[in-house]
Amino acid sequence: MDERIVKFLKKMHLASVCAIDDEGQPYAFSAFYAFDELNFCLLLASCDESSHVKFLKNSKLVAGTVALDTKIVGKIEGVQFQGVMREASANEREIYFKRFFYAKAMDPKIWSISLEKVKFTSNTLGFGKK
């Protein structure tokens, strides 16, 4: 995998993700994530009662973005992704809690998004460079 993508995903912590709702429409949500570099997954916490988790019965396919929050055009960087969301393994849970140790007290369910397609854009390389 492109080392720039790995470095960027390790540095960031907030993803915008889109699932498919009961009417087949896109449903967006934001989540803090930990990056599992070995398995190339984003790990996030969410409860079974959340709308986006309920929508996984329709399709486990998701898409989303991770972007640097900046107003300076020359510093814009981001990842666009497509993947599959499923319940995280015990090892993945540990990776999440290593990054967000304070969340362990709430004992949330952890989910894994395997990154199947990824595109990285960085204006630091020149405007609109992929």
Residue ranges of model-derived segments:
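Extreme N-terminal tail/first-helix region
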Residues: 1-16
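Short acidic (Asp/Glu) patches
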Residues: 46-50, 63-68, 91-102
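Short beta-strand segments
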Residues: 12-48, 63-66
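Active-site-adjacent structural patch at catalytic or cofactor/ligand-binding sites
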Residues: 46-48, 58-69, 77-86
